[in-house]
């Protein structure tokens, strides 16, 4: 996997466009207080399992994959607006 995106403010959804080939994503999220984090597609369907906590991998058990032409979003939902959250997203290939 290679780094695809660094997100300084992960409390806003981060868009990941799959342009050339089927792609799988994983992210590490770190927050100042517990958050919920997941990948979702254009239909708002969750791709992979959700993270609940202050830090960890999203999805926790393996990558979220998308087909060429699809768009995924990393969504980090804070419990309160004052939470600081950051993320790094990796992709393969």
Model-identified regions with their sequence ranges:
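Acidic, Ser/Thr/Pro-rich low-complexity intrinsically disordered segments
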Residues: 6-93
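A general sequence property marking short-to-moderate contiguous segments
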Residues: 1-4
């Amino acid at each position: 996997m290679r780094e695809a995106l660094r997100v300084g403010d992960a409390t806003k959804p981060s868009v990941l466009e799959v342009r050339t080939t089927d792609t799988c994503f994983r992210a590490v999220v770190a927050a100042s207080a517990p958050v919920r984090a997941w990948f979702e597609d254009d239909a708002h369907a969750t791709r992979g399992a959700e993270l609940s906590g202050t830090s960890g991998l999203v999805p926790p058990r393996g990558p979220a994959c998308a087909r060429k032409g699809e768009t995924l979003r990393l969504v980090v939902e804070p419990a309160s607006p004052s939470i600081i959250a950051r993320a790094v997203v990796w992709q393969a290939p």
